[in-house]
Amino acid sequence: VENIRSKNDLGVEKFVGSWYLREAAKTMEFSIPLFDMDIKEVNLTPEGNLELVLLEKTDRCVEKKLLLKKTKKPTEFEIYISSESSYTFCVMETDYDSYFLFCLYNISDREKMACAHYVRRIEENKGMNEFKKILRTLAMPYTVIEVRTRDMCHV
């Protein structure tokens, strides 16, 4: 993770809204199903944290909420996932209008890591090359997950 460079600054208020998962990559040690979900909405809390409302596909679509707590670094947030541990959610790249890329890694075990590419519109492909560049910097083996949008819950 040390060799991955994130954005220097972030306008968190520009993330508000819906995002669709386009593709993801995760290490073998990463077991959280976060990357099987679209983001129904991103909300900014009064404290400057981000609240994600996710749509999880099980036998039906279920809403889940995650709170991303701001840190001293403007592009990083801390997230606690029950039955797991604390993770750092790091925004790697975005143009705010069409795509954003982030990586999520375990604070105590950096081998547990995943990165994802989200888009504003289902048919959007912007950010694909930037996502591939990030994947080339990963030091550990990973699996790429291609998302079939028909299998996802839609906003």
Curated annotation (Swiss-Prot):
InterPro entries in alphabetical order: Calycin, Lipocalin, Lipocln_cytosolic_FA-bd_dom
Subcellular localization, as worded in the UniProt entry: Secreted
Disulfide partners: C61-C153, C103-C115
Main location: secreted
Pfam (any one): Lipocalin
Cleaved signal peptide residues: none
GO CC entries: extracellular region
One GO molecular-function entry: retinol binding
Record key words, sorted: Disulfide bond, Milk protein, Retinol-binding, Secreted, Transport
Family: Belongs to the calycin superfamily. Lipocalin family.
PANTHER family for the chain: GLYCODELIN, LIPOCALIN
Functional description taken from the UniProt entry: Lactoglobulin is the primary component of whey, it binds retinol and is probably involved in the transport of that molecule.
Subunit structure: Monomer.
Protein name: Beta-lactoglobulin
